[in-house]
Amino acid sequence: MKHLLFFFAALLVSTAASPQSEAYARDIITVLASEKYEGRGYYKNGARKSAKYLRKTFKNSGLKPVGGDFFQPFNIAINCITGKPELALNGRPLVPGTEFLVSRNSPTIKGTFKVKTLNTAPADLDSLLAVTEGQDLSETFIATANTNRVLMEENVFDAAGVILLTKQLWWHVSNGHQVMDIPVIKAGITAAPEEIHTVTVAVRNKYHEAYTTENVAAMVRGTRYPEKYILLTAHYDHLGRMGKEVYFPGAHDNASGTAMIADLARYFAQNPAPVSLLFIAFSAEETGLEGSKYYAQNPLVPLDSTLFSLNLDIIGSGSTGITVVNGSVLPEYFSLLTAINEKNTYVKNIGKRGEAANSDHYFLYKNGVPAFFIYTTGEEYTEYHNVNDRAEGLPLTAYNGLFGLVRDFVLLLPIPR
């Protein structure tokens, strides 16, 4: 690999993306993170609207479908929070999205209930259960700062509902595959009264047992080895809507990565690589990596002919560099990446991690395809899984450098004969 690196390094122009490239990506981020695309979720078909937009984007760049279509459809089970969620504590209404969140596995409920507040160590679930043992809480909400994940998945108190008091209002959809028998609501500690006596709540849900969503895939054929493939991937889905009035833009996570693979697709459509490049915008990453898992089980090109898969997720910052998941377990590929960066100083630093099932590289790697997941690092932008992850605040600090690094890595990957 070292000989290949130095052979090809002399042929590369040491430049990152152009300002026009970053502007192109920012336009895509602005579109995908706009309210028109509904947070790219499943209530009001935001994910489907986004898939159609990306198909058009790939086509306009001159890419071709794999087989007869750009779409690879599959089904997921998902619960959606619809209508207008409402929450009032001691009679004072809280603002949805910024002061409270409704867990994605919550059922329809409406009414006013008394509240039992349990003050105990945040992770000590056994103490909470001991305090409530033998009590009839069927018409009572439990309010607690306990952070045990079980509270979002099981009705351990046999209560009417649970209010989780938290400093960080992060929303997730990975628990939306089924519906609990009670609602779970996250409320901001600063928005909640010191003593909660009553809760008035209104939640509506709609459960989809088999919602059809789609991966979006497009190809640039290789000039010398068209039957060898490199995958460039990012998930385009996000959290969607919590009712009619609140949506989660998802600019950093992951309109940013989606925009870069669209930008790379445009570049390689005009400058084809020796091997074929497959660009895949995955759906249903936020629900549990379901889109990439489906692809790994139903690949559009042979996995044994896939040389590498590079996944981009959360790349809107970068003041301190990037981190590479699987960098520790694929040292030769990581050495290639760092050698390219040392030559061109594309990003400030490249950190590495081991295996992690935290993005769409995972199931490809587990099915035998060498794979990296790259994300940017830096404190200049920290919005995550909330209503403030918007396009207008996204700095794209390391965008140009990361573009150049990924482009060169694709061109320098060794091609087995």
Show which residues each predicted segment covers.
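Metal-dependent peptidase/peptidase-like ectodomains
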Residues: 273, 282-382
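Second-shell loop/turn segments in exported
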Residues: 35-45, 60, 72-75, 117-119, ...
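Soluble metallo-hydrolase cores and metallopeptidase-like ectodomains found primarily
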Residues: 107-113, 168-249, 266, 270, ...
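Acidic/His- and Gly-rich active-site-bordering loop/insert found
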Residues: 32, 58, 74, 78-82, ...
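His/Asp/Glu-rich mid-to-C-terminal helical/loop segments that flank catalytic regions of hydrolases
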Residues: 266, 381-417
